């Protein structure tokens, strides 16, 4: 039985990694070992940051809602609590959008939240 060497698979794997490393600076786009390390690191960063993105946006929305709520005489927690008590179930993304783009509508929500005590 003939000895099988993995040249075809190895070449394909190397090409795949080097293709992913296209655009990297210097040896990281030319040499397989360095390209492989750089690609693995970048994929790891991408994986982690897809999760961090969700946390970051939630923090941004909360900061915007808090700022708008304080303009209307409420804290963030009292505003959210008042909305829940009055049965208004808007998510933080929508509330933050209202706070930025439609201050009048947000002010009405704030009044509703104040009245729900």
Curated annotation (Swiss-Prot):
Keyword field: Ribonucleoprotein, Ribosomal protein, RNA-binding, rRNA-binding
SUPFAM superfamilies tied to this protein: Ribosomal protein L20 (SSF74731)
Superkingdom of source: Bacteria
GO biological-process terms attached to the record: ribosomal large subunit assembly; translation
Pfam families per UniProt: Ribosomal_L20 (PF00453)
A GO term for molecular function: structural constituent of ribosome
CC per GO annotation: ribonucleoprotein complex; ribosome
Role played: Binds directly to 23S ribosomal RNA and is necessary for the in vitro assembly process of the 50S ribosomal subunit. It is not involved in the protein synthesizing functions of that subunit.
Similarity remark: Belongs to the bacterial ribosomal protein bL20 family.
HAMAP family found in the cross-reference section: Ribosomal_bL20
Cross-referenced NCBIfam families: rplT_bact (TIGR01032)
Protein name: Large ribosomal subunit protein bL20
Annotated organism of origin: Ruminiclostridium cellulolyticum (strain ATCC 35319 / DSM 5812 / JCM 6584 / H10) (Clostridium cellulolyticum)
